[in-house]
Amino acid sequence: VSYVDDTTGKTLKTDSISGTTGSKSSYSTSGNIADYKKHGYELVTDGYPADLTFDNNDTTDQNFTVHLKHQLTPVNPTDPQTPGAPINPDEPDGPKWPARTNYDKTVNETVSYVDQTGHVVAKQHTDSVNFTRTVVVDNVTGEVITSGAGTKAWTATNGDTTFDAVVSPVVSGSVANKAQIAAVTDLNADSANVTETVTYTKVGSLVPSSSDGNFPRVPTVVYPNDPSDATKVTPAGVPTVPGYTAHDPEGHVLTPGSSYQPSDPTKDTTITYTADTQKGS
């Protein structure tokens, strides 16, 4: 009596039995079949007759075959198994259920907003795309089968395979090094996590200065943030100081009430004031 693994084509074991001509065999395949089932097999056909009678042919053996195959179990997020637990309860040291990542994966996006020292200046942005599939687990070997009958390919939850572009938030008094994080398209289950950092630097100021000893104390003017672009500032209003004329770094006269757009929003700009010539009466 041969026990054959139809999945691999190999013979698992062979039992030899004998008896006198015309006698009934007491041999049964049920015990072996039950044991194989405990190890993840399922019965295909039992070719051994229930009431075998030994024949009278001494030259030719009576051969019978029991066919078994590996039991296959579909696994997916809606019908999961406990990862690491024995597939066959009666075989604690045997094959184990696979990790959930074999059929359930999430790709994450994280965007952090920090200053030059790493201090958080705005709420972190997070997003994720989930992918699931159905795999088939071989109950005999623990092999994870990802194609063929009973399996389903990776699909994105809700059909979403994109991280949308993320506009950097405006942080008062600072400018960002990136206006936005670009969109990431065509994500799949094997895509790497996306980790981005946007760094903010404090904006500069207009700094009034004069060599005139009578020049009054004039406060600096911090560059205003551009409300529509975290990387930019808008022109800063030049302080009007009665009796003095303002000049930009290139020496150009700045008219009272005018504004100045700095070339580098993170650098201070010195506005030089010269005393107006007093006219006699």
Give short role names for the model-derived ranges.
Residues 1-281:
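Extracellular modular ligand-binding repeats in secreted and cell-surface proteins
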